[in-house]
């Protein structure tokens, strides 16, 4: 049912719609906005459900998931990969969040982690994205959520701008996202960085 719900609630580009918010509740992309982070989790969910469907010998559902995952994968590849990182997403007005030339918040942690965890990123993409995370987001206390923090260029749904730079959702460090980046680095064989 969760797959069907998401397939019935897609944004303008065909990725899962933001509805209220994704994991980052200070990032409001709008009801029809789209989160790359959620799209990558959805991609991974389809991989897992295909294993269950194979166990049940449900070839029709496997075919449905294969087709849906292939379509979603093409969208993520075409819309969300930005040279050396995956963008954060799209507002419902079509604004791209987290692209390389954004003056603020142009590098986000969670899409990079989940591109690797989901198995979506190619080896080259995974290594480029994780290098950006290591170079730009890593601190002695853990990886920050994004860089640079919001200050003057936040979009309307960037509620993180109410917090000082480096605190909470405005480039703070969150325990959940640490587990994800540790897993992503470990999956790429970067035990020293994990």
Question: Residue spans of the language-model regions?
Answer:
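Mature extracytoplasmic enzyme cores
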Residues: 1-21, 28-41, 45-56, 64
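Aromatic-rich carbohydrate-recognition surfaces in CAZymes
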Residues: 1-14, 35-43, 126, 171-194
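Beta-sheet entry/capping signal
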Residues: 13-17, 84-85, 114, 193
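Short clusters of hydrophobic/aromatic residues that line enzyme substrate/ligand-binding pockets
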Residues: 15-18, 86, 146, 163
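Short linear capping/connector segments at secondary-structure termini
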Residues: 20-24, 91-93
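Solvent-exposed loop and edge beta-strand segments that line ligand/cofactor-binding
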Residues: 26-39, 94-118, 160-178, 183, ...
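Catalytic cores of carbohydrate-active enzymes
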Residues: 41-158
């Amino acid at each position: 049912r969760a797959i069907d719900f998401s397939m019935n609630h897609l944004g303008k580009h065909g990725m899962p719609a933001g509805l209220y918010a994704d994991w980052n509740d200070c990032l409001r992309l709008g009801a029809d906005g789209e989160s790359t982070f959620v799209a990558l989790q959805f991609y991974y969910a389809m991989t897992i459900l295909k294993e269950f469907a194979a166990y049940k010998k449900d070839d029709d559902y496997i075919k449905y998931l294969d087709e849906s995952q292939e379509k979603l994968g093409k969208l993520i590849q075409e819309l969300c990969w930005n040279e050396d990182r995956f963008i954060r997403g799209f507002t419902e007005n079509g604004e791209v969040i987290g692209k390389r030339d954004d003056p603020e918040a142009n590098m986000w942690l969670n899409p990079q982690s989940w591109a690797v965890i989901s198995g979506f990123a190619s080896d080259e993409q995974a290594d480029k994205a994780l290098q950006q995370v290591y170079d730009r987001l890593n601190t002695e206390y853990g990886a920050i959520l994004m860089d640079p923090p919001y200050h003057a260029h936040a979009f309307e749904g960037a509620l993180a701008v109410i917090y000082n730079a480096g605190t909470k959702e405005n480039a703070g460090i969150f325990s959940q996202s640490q587990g994800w980046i540790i897993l992503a680095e470990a999956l790429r064989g970067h035990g020293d960085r994990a």
